[in-house]
Amino acid sequence: MDLIRQLEAEQAQKIAAKRTLPDFSPGDTLRVQVRVTEGNRTRVQAFEGVCIARSGSGLQENFTVRKISYGEGVERVFPVYSPLVEAVEVVRRGKVRRAKLYYLRDRRGKSARISENTGARARKLNDAEREAAAQERARIEAEKVAAAEALAAEKAAAEAAEAKSE
């Protein structure tokens, strides 16, 4: 493996350690949590729409999400390994036969709908995601409990030191 691919793989592993993205493909309805900076304030904004394409590979991998906002089509291209993408949630699995769904740009109304995939693979992916999300919630809850216990112990030690000095 050449040096550039090796460095890209290391960076991808570093980013993947911080957050995990679910397996999704074109046709899936996604909710992307994006960090937006306005002036000196930073907030997280949700962008929900249909994934119409995935392109690139390695650190340059992107996915395009399309939604209809106030009757106007809006598309955003998100880099998979961008630090601005906080989380991606699969709302529903779509059943499509194409890798690029650019034809949806010309469609309106019912013809732009994508039927839901209820096959075995979709069920397996949904179950795996639910399990991973439950584990993540349990891990976060355990971190909160550990932090609360550490804070309580620190507070008790400070009170004991204060009582000893009196």
Swiss-Prot record:
<dbReference type="InterPro" id="IPR008991">
    <property type="entry name" value="Translation_prot_SH3-like_sf"/>
</dbReference>
<keyword id="KW-0689">Ribosomal protein</keyword>
<dbReference type="InterPro" id="IPR018257">
    <property type="entry name" value="Ribosomal_bL19_CS"/>
</dbReference>
<dbReference type="GO" id="GO:0006412">
    <property type="term" value="P:translation"/>
</dbReference>
<comment type="similarity">
    <text>Belongs to the bacterial ribosomal protein bL19 family.</text>
</comment>
<comment type="function">
    <text>This protein is located at the 30S-50S ribosomal subunit interface and may play a role in the structure and function of the aminoacyl-tRNA binding site.</text>
</comment>
<dbReference type="Pfam" id="PF01245">
    <property type="entry name" value="Ribosomal_L19"/>
</dbReference>
<keyword id="KW-0687">Ribonucleoprotein</keyword>
<protein>
    <recommendedName>
        <fullName>Large ribosomal subunit protein bL19</fullName>
    </recommendedName>
</protein>
<dbReference type="InterPro" id="IPR038657">
    <property type="entry name" value="Ribosomal_bL19_sf"/>
</dbReference>
<dbReference type="InterPro" id="IPR001857">
    <property type="entry name" value="Ribosomal_bL19"/>
</dbReference>
<dbReference type="GO" id="GO:0022625">
    <property type="term" value="C:cytosolic large ribosomal subunit"/>
</dbReference>
<dbReference type="GO" id="GO:0003735">
    <property type="term" value="F:structural constituent of ribosome"/>
</dbReference>
